[in-house]
């Protein structure tokens, strides 16, 4: 199964693509990274134009990698001037995934941390170490948004 993980944002959307294969008779399986990176939007453009950039680039990623499941980080904001724009960008991401008919699972940050490290209060380094271990990577995936998206993809596999 191919899973696309997404770490939503307006300036940078992290994405990570993994392939997973269940092992017979075991709950866990093997997984490997196919691709990861970011969708970067131009801060000099209007929010609407940036949403178009996000949708366009995500469509291309979906067409190239043909995922069977999308796993998206679900986040909660308290007070931030950027909240509305990020929520709108997340809506564009969800809509684009739905247009491709992809099943979508969503996880809050604590659940992602729990799935990868065994506790919901892990720091970024602990999550990164878990991503590297699970995907058998020698070097950390960069940038951080891409590494976060791989964590989201792995959570989709572990929890789906």
UniProtKB/Swiss-Prot annotation:
<keyword id="KW-0233">DNA recombination</keyword>
<keyword id="KW-0255">Endonuclease</keyword>
<keyword id="KW-0234">DNA repair</keyword>
<comment type="function">
    <text>The RuvA-RuvB-RuvC complex processes Holliday junction (HJ) DNA during genetic recombination and DNA repair. Endonuclease that resolves HJ intermediates. Cleaves cruciform DNA by making single-stranded nicks across the HJ at symmetrical positions within the homologous arms, yielding a 5'-phosphate and a 3'-hydroxyl group; requires a central core of homology in the junction. The consensus cleavage sequence is 5'-(A/T)TT(C/G)-3'. Cleavage occurs on the 3'-side of the TT dinucleotide at the point of strand exchange.</text>
</comment>
<dbReference type="InterPro" id="IPR012337">
    <property type="entry name" value="RNaseH-like_sf"/>
</dbReference>
<feature type="binding site">
    <location>
        <position position="7"/>
    </location>
    <ligand>
        <name>Mg(2+) 1</name>
    </ligand>
</feature>
<dbReference type="GO" id="GO:0003677">
    <property type="term" value="F:DNA binding"/>
</dbReference>
<dbReference type="GO" id="GO:0006310">
    <property type="term" value="P:DNA recombination"/>
</dbReference>
<keyword id="KW-0378">Hydrolase</keyword>
<dbReference type="InterPro" id="IPR002176">
    <property type="entry name" value="X-over_junc_endoDNase_RuvC"/>
</dbReference>
<dbReference type="GO" id="GO:0048476">
    <property type="term" value="C:Holliday junction resolvase complex"/>
</dbReference>
<feature type="active site">
    <location>
        <position position="145"/>
    </location>
</feature>
<feature type="binding site">
    <location>
        <position position="73"/>
    </location>
    <ligand>
        <name>Mg(2+) 2</name>
    </ligand>
</feature>
<dbReference type="GO" id="GO:0006281">
    <property type="term" value="P:DNA repair"/>
</dbReference>
<keyword id="KW-0963">Cytoplasm</keyword>
<dbReference type="GO" id="GO:0005737">
    <property type="term" value="C:cytoplasm"/>
</dbReference>
<dbReference type="InterPro" id="IPR036397">
    <property type="entry name" value="RNaseH_sf"/>
</dbReference>
<comment type="subunit">
    <text>Homodimer which binds Holliday junction (HJ) DNA. The HJ becomes 2-fold symmetrical on binding to RuvC with unstacked arms; it has a different conformation from HJ DNA in complex with RuvA. In the full resolvosome a probable DNA-RuvA(4)-RuvB(12)-RuvC(2) complex forms which resolves the HJ.</text>
</comment>
<dbReference type="GO" id="GO:0008821">
    <property type="term" value="F:crossover junction DNA endonuclease activity"/>
</dbReference>
<feature type="binding site">
    <location>
        <position position="145"/>
    </location>
    <ligand>
        <name>Mg(2+) 1</name>
    </ligand>
</feature>
<keyword id="KW-0238">DNA-binding</keyword>
<keyword id="KW-0540">Nuclease</keyword>
<comment type="similarity">
    <text>Belongs to the RuvC family.</text>
</comment>
<dbReference type="GO" id="GO:0000287">
    <property type="term" value="F:magnesium ion binding"/>
</dbReference>
<keyword id="KW-0460">Magnesium</keyword>
<feature type="active site">
    <location>
        <position position="73"/>
    </location>
</feature>
<dbReference type="Pfam" id="PF02075">
    <property type="entry name" value="RuvC"/>
</dbReference>
<dbReference type="InterPro" id="IPR020563">
    <property type="entry name" value="X-over_junc_endoDNase_Mg_BS"/>
</dbReference>
<keyword id="KW-0227">DNA damage</keyword>
<feature type="active site">
    <location>
        <position position="7"/>
    </location>
</feature>
<protein>
    <recommendedName>
        <fullName>Crossover junction endodeoxyribonuclease RuvC</fullName>
        <ecNumber>3.1.21.10</ecNumber>
    </recommendedName>
</protein>
<keyword id="KW-0479">Metal-binding</keyword>
